[in-house]
Regions:
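Hydrophobic alpha-helical
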Residues: 1-57
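Generic structural signal for well-ordered, non-membrane alpha-helical segments
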Residues: 5-8, 76, 80
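Alpha-helical scaffold segments in soluble metabolic enzymes
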Residues: 34-38, 62, 82, 86
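Short beta-strand elements at the ligand-binding edges of bilobed clamshell
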Residues: 65-77
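Hinge/cleft segment of the Venus flytrap/periplasmic-binding protein
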Residues: 78-113
Length: 113
């Protein structure tokens, strides 16, 4: 969906039309609002396991309502900090500096913060 909800909704609508046996959906990008809208209008949200990225207010509501089953969340502030550290190390020619891996959190309806 090119990280655009207006594109994502059309892609998911088509996917749902073409695959009546679909049991799972994974959205790696943005555009989760399009996924939500397409699933809710299709009346199939309870039949399809849905995993997306980034715990936004829309994703939170979709988890609570049961439209989404899991959200993989990364702390974007830490990601930006690590990216800046990596760029500084590159500019300083410090080939030994490696930022640590970014922690992932997986949220479901029962463990929302």
């Amino acid at each position: 969906g090119r990280d655009d909800s207006t594109v994502t909704i059309e892609v998911v609508r088509q996917l749902l039309r073409d695959h009546d046996d679909l049991i799972g959906l994974y959205n790696i990008g943005a555009g989760n609002r399009g996924v939500i809208e397409a699933l809710e209008e299709s009346q199939r949200k309870d039949d399809i396991a849905v995993v997306v990225h980034e715990l936004t207010r829309h994703a939170r509501r979709a988890l609570v309502s049961g439209t989404f089953d899991a959200v993989i969340n990364q702390n974007y502030k830490i990601e930006v900090d690590y990216a800046i550290q990596a760029l500084k190390a590159y500019v300083d020619s410090d080939v030994t500096a490696l930022p640590p891996p970014v922690q992932l959190d997986i949220y479901m309806r029962d463990n929302l913060p």
